[in-house]
Amino acid sequence: MNKNYILLIAVLLLSPFRIVGQKEVNTDDTILNFLNLKFGMFIHYNMGTYQAEQWAYPFHDPKDFKPSQLDCNQWAQAAKSAGMQYAVFTTKHHDGFSLWDTKVSNYDIASAHKKYKNLDIVKEYTDAFRNAGIKVGLYFSVWDRHHGMEHGNINQENISFTKEQLTELLTNYGEINCIVIDGWGSKWGNGPDFEELPYETLEAHIHSIQPNCLVINHSCRPDLKYTQIVHYEATHGQHCPYDNTIPSQQGPTLQSTWFWEKGYENQELKSVDEVVKELNFANSHYSNYLLNAAPNEKGLMDENVLTRLKQIGDATMLSAPLKKLPEIKPVHQGISVMASSSSGKEFGANHIIDADLFTRWQYAQDDNERWIELDFKSPKTFNRVICGEYKRAVQEFKIEAFINGEWKLLVKGGNIRNNFNASFETITAQKYRLTILKASRLPYIAELTFVKY
């Protein structure tokens, strides 16, 4: 091979620029501009809203979808009142019901009740948010149970189906700031993996239509091989690390779940103080903050949501824009991890700090001590701990810091579950430890993260 050709390939691989058609796109600038949006609204609204299902059954009657008072302008004004600068809307979730009149399926809004036949909710959303001065993004699930887009069943026909739907979304609704893709390369559910549906296949397709649309793969791992922006799944104990330099997005919920359910109109929501602290931390660690606010079955935001978003806006002052991207380094660099035991190589201690929800630590069956310790190699100051567990086995635990030659209790709790998140007095220490005191069976601990708000 010609040496000059080899050199050209090397330069292209290292360059922040990407050639799309005849257009040169500076991906670093696109990513920097996205991070500087700081604060966004995630909007989960789809068939699950009407079924009290977070993963809706994929064969509900389209006529069950009844947005009787849909008002996307209300959503947009709510986002504006909170100081949000972009939004992401669920065009299609894992059940495969599309909220636009897709030409490749009848399982969509056009097949709902006749009064909604001409309703295009994606257009209603994009128009309303643009008119409010808010950038628009879309959410799209490639795991589509209605149309058979599932692991082990991926073929050229359903890949073409997926591409055609993405073409519709990226052609008919103006400039799309980002597209969050879910159900892809994830161990939750049964979506396609990256061998069945290579990341490059969809990224290239998306960028052939909209070169500046960021592809954000919601795969719950800090790996830029499969995404342009890492999405930290805050609802499952995956928190932006204290030393994060990866361009990222953190996604918590204002209500207790992604989709609205009956009774949420009276629910105690995430507090203003929590949101402001999480937002400020994310923004100071190369991450923007995408807060989910779910509309109700009428297609409206509940009054408690409207009030809370306005309170958040009154309490929020966004930080100054980033001027450049940092050098990207692995998360939790330099930390050593020790554990009382591990049940096998697959469940090694280091998994607890890799920011990957699908790797986990598990102690051995005969372990009576059941602790895992993080040594930061030098004193670090923290006041919050976040821990995520898979399958909910822990019944009692404690978290400690090693100070003046002894372990000092920081937090004691019962269940960890998906997302244990607690504050403690500000402490400076080199070593921190989690001990499982009681469990119904061998637990799987996905992440243990310490930060300072």
Question: Residue ranges of each PLM-predicted region?
Answer:
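Acidic, glycine-anchored loop motifs typical of Ca2+
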Residues: H351-L357
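Exposed low-complexity, polar/acidic, P/S/T/G-rich flexible segments that act as propeptides
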Residues: L442-Y453
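Short, surface-exposed beta-strand/strand-loop-strand elements in extracellular ectodomains
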Residues: A393-G405
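Extracellular Ig-like/FN3 beta-sandwich strand-entry sites
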Residues: A429-K431
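Mature catalytic domains of secreted/periplasmic carbohydrate-active enzymes
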Residues: G21-N350, Y363-D366, L374, T381, ...
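Residue-level signal for short segments within beta-strands and strand-turn junctions
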Residues: E389, A401-I403, K452
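Bacterial Sec-dependent N-terminal signal peptides
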Residues: M1-K23
